[in-house]
């Protein structure tokens, strides 16, 4: 992987990640872009104890532009990327919810092909995305304001995505996200109750012995969790516990693309041939880099994992009522996790079944 850092016309950082070491990225962005001054603040809810960021600037995001005006496509379309094509590119979000002392937001373009999706990538291309996520995690973790790095992809207009080009985002939070805090609390309680046991290890061992396993390799395992909140919710874990993407060894990095690409393609097949691509939310959960607030728990106790979910309002015919969320945020599923796992095994690639 070759990494090249440069600047856009408005001063934002842009980083190229190339498969070929001899790739040269020396184009200069000469667009008449005004420098954006974005401020944000993080407010803490005194009753719930969690935090929420907000952008203190007028809304101006690009909303569903035609393909010939996509700002994530290569040059020639008045866009952020100035070269004819790219492998993977990351740049600072022009309209961030986190900025300055409140963290940072970045956009990750998985490919220069506007009509592709992550599932269309080759294993080599997908590996490059993993390496880019890892590098950004390392870089952002060194910012004084950053406590947790959150890499994710939302796909589909149903999720609220406003650009069709295959891309994800990275939020570098100045606090520990609520879901991570809940996991750390449970981790600490389990460690105390068992005299040092690790909750993540226990959960993974139990799931691998059960009927909810969807896909398994030598170094990775995907399963529908026993207590899944969403109708189709898959958790993907490395079998060797590591706190973040930086901890993955070469064997795990090499196998990940094959496992993840098959998982994505299964989700695209669950509603049958000829159906449009399935919208989803995919997010990496990494250990916070700041001081953990739970006594007896360290970063190494946390387990890196990817949470992949299909929203309840997608394809209602297949997921009847999918999920009901009441005013008290109590999740109710109409698709049992065991049935969801069975369905995802049914649509395995023919080569995966052999």
Curated annotation (Swiss-Prot):
Residues 36-72 are annotated as: Disordered. It catalyses: alpha-D-galactose 1-phosphate + UDP-alpha-D-glucose = alpha-D-glucose 1-phosphate + UDP-alpha-D-galactose. Gene3D superfamilies: HIT-like (3.30.428.10). One of its GO terms (cellular component) is cytoplasm. The keyword NAD does not apply. Its EC number is 2.7.7.12. Zn(2+) binds at residues 70, 73, 114, 165. Pfam families: GalP_UDP_tr_C (PF02744), GalP_UDP_transf (PF01087). It comes from the Bacteria. Belongs to the galactose-1-phosphate uridylyltransferase type 1 family. One of its GO terms (molecular function) is zinc ion binding. PROSITE patterns: GAL_P_UDP_TRANSF_I. InterPro entries: GalP_UDPtransf1, GalP_UDPtransf1_His-AS, GalP_Utransf_C, GalP_Utransf_N, HIT-like_sf. Its cofactor is Zn(2+). The active site is at residue 167. Binds 1 zinc ion per subunit. Pathway: Carbohydrate metabolism; galactose metabolism. This is Galactose-1-phosphate uridylyltransferase. GO terms for biological process: galactose catabolic process via UDP-galactose, Leloir pathway. UDP-alpha-D-glucose binds at residues 154, 169, 332. Keywords: Carbohydrate metabolism, Galactose metabolism, Iron, Metal-binding, Nucleotidyltransferase, Transferase, Zinc. It is an enzyme of class 2 (transferase).
């Amino acid at each position: 992987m070759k990494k090249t850092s440069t600047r856009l016309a408005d001063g934002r950082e842009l980083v190229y990640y190339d498969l070929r070491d001899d790739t040269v990225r020396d184009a200069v962005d000469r667009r008449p872009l005004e420098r954006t001054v974005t401020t944000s603040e993080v407010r803490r809810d005194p009753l719930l104890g969690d935090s929420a960021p907000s952008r203190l600037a007028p809304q101006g995001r690009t909303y569903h532009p035609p393909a010939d005006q996509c700002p994530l496509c290569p040059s020639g379309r008045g866009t952020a990327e100035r070269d004819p094509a790219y492998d993977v590119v990351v740049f600072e979000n022009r309209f961030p919810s986190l900025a300055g002392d409140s963290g940072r937001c970045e956009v990750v373009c998985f490919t220069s092909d506007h009509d592709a999706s992550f599932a269309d990538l080759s294993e080599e291309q997908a590996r490059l995305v993993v390496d880019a996520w890892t590098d950004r995690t390392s870089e952002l973790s060194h910012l004084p304001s950053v406590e947790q790095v959150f890499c994710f992809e939302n796909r589909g207009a149903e999720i609220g995505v406003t650009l069709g080009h295959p891309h994800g985002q990275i939020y570098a939070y100045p606090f520990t996200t609520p879901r991570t805090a809940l996991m750390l609390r449970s981790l600490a309680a389990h460690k105390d109750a068992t005299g040092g046991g690790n909750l993540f290890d226990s959960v993974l061992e139990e799931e691998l012995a059960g009927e909810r396993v969807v896909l398994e390799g030598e170094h990775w395992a995907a399963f529908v969790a026993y207590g899944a909140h969403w109708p189709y919710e898959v958790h993907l874990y490395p079998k060797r516990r590591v706190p973040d993407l930086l901890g993955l060894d070469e064997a795990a990095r090499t196998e990940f693309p094959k496992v993840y690409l098959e998982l994505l393609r299964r989700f695209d097949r669950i509603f049958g041939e000829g159906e449009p691509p399935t919208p989803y939310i995919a997010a990496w959960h990494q250990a916070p880099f700041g001081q953990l607030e739970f006594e007896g728990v360290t970063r190494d106790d946390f387990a890196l994992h990817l949470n992949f979910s299909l929203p309840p309002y997608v394809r209602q015919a297949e997921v009847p009522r999918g999920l009901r969320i009441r005013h008290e945020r109590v999740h109710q599923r109409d698709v049992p996790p065991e049935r969801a796992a069975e369905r995802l095994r049914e649509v395995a690639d023919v080569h995966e079944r052999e």
